Amino acid sequence: MKNLFLSICAAAVLASCGSMTSASASKVGKAQPALSNTKWTLAETVKGKVPTLNIEGEKITGNAGCNNYFGTATIDPSNGGFIAGQMGSTKMMCNNISVEQNFMDMMGKANKYVITGNTLELYKDNLLLLKFTKSE
């Protein structure tokens, strides 16, 4: 029963992340504001701690829902490029590990970003993977 619940949660997260508005789609691959020194919180509702993304230069850190992660990213505002490099994380045992693994997997697949107001969207080509809201 627990595995079924986790599978349904993971499918819901993936399905909701696959949608894209035409306004966002038209901005993918175009010049974007710089991401350096920004903090973001995942906009999707997930059980447990909400994943975060902190960007300082080409270093990325945050919390994936239970474990903290860290790594590098190649970010190019001239074309909205975002490519996460190899990432590491703490290794705590977590109840929502499948959600965390999906989050980390999507971070690793992203290759573009779009900023609209206080919203950051990470894409794989034209497929929306993750949506964040700006944190203070």
What are the language-model segments listed below?
Residues 1-15:
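Sec-dependent bacterial lipoprotein signal peptides
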Residues 6, 17-136:
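Lipid interaction determinants
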